[in-house]
């Protein structure tokens, strides 16, 4: 999506991918949502747009998978990876180190004291399907908590609260056919 504000791959990376494909005698081309009608002309779909369940990328991924195409990001991966609540529970189950977390429900009374008692202060509130800091608020006191809850509960009735863990990077792990393909550091933009 050339109009995407925070694309997962820049133009230079996409052009490099096309160069490598050409060297390997693979016909590859960049397609957009407008090319959806041509999807079945291809053998594989490699999505390089930020995916979400209510986005055309998910529908294209489903269509490609249903028609037997190789798909990266496949529909199940999109469902799993765009849901922070699911990922948090998976990390707990598999004993993968992660920031301390707890679920916050709209139907409960939520106070700064009770959350910070478990997670410390400050802490982060996240909607389950946010990305690139969308739907995420850092909370340092009761006033900020109330404002964040008012804003975020308009988007989701369940929030994930996590201890604040300053870091210069996140990890990105690529999985293909259930096997780890790569691990890389995803560095934060300044002021993030």
Where are these regions (language model features)?
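A short linear hydrophobic-aromatic micro-motif
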Residues: 30, 100, 122-125, 158-162
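Short acidic/polar capping segments at secondary-structure boundaries
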Residues: 2-4, 77-78, 106-109, 128-132, ...
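Short, hinge-like loop/turn segments at secondary-structure boundaries
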Residues: 46-48, 89-92, 117-120, 142-143, ...
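Phosphate-binding site of ATP-dependent enzymes
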Residues: 134-192
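Rossmann-like NAD(P)H-binding beta-loop-alpha module
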Residues: 99-122
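Conserved N-proximal alpha/beta basic substrate-recognition cap immediately N-terminal to
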Residues: 1-100
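Conserved residues at the C-terminal ends of beta-strands
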Residues: 48, 104, 186
């Amino acid at each position: 999506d050339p109009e995407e504000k925070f694309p997962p791959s820049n133009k230079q990376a996409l052009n490099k991918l096309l160069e490598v494909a050409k060297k390997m005698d693979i016909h590859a081309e960049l397609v957009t949502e407008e090319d959806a009608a041509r999807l079945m002309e291809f053998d594989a779909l490699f999505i390089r747009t930020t995916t979400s369940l209510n986005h055309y990328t998910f529908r294209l991924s489903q269509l490609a998978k249903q028609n037997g195409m190789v798909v990266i990001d496949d529909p199940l991966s999109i469902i799993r990876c765009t849901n922070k609540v699911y990922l948090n529970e998976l990390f707990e189950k598999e004993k993968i180190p992660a920031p301390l977390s707890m679920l916050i429900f709209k139907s409960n009374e939520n106070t700064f004291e009770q959350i910070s008692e478990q997670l410390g202060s400050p802490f982060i509130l996240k909607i389950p399907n946010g990305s690139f800091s969308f739907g995420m608020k850092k909370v340092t006191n009761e006033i900020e908590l109330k404002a964040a809850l008012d804003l975020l509960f308009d988007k989701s009735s369940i929030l994930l609260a996590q201890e604040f863990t300053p870091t210069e990077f996140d990890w990105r792990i690529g999985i293909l056919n259930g096997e780890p393909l790569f691990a890389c550091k995803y560095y934060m933009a300044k002021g993030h």
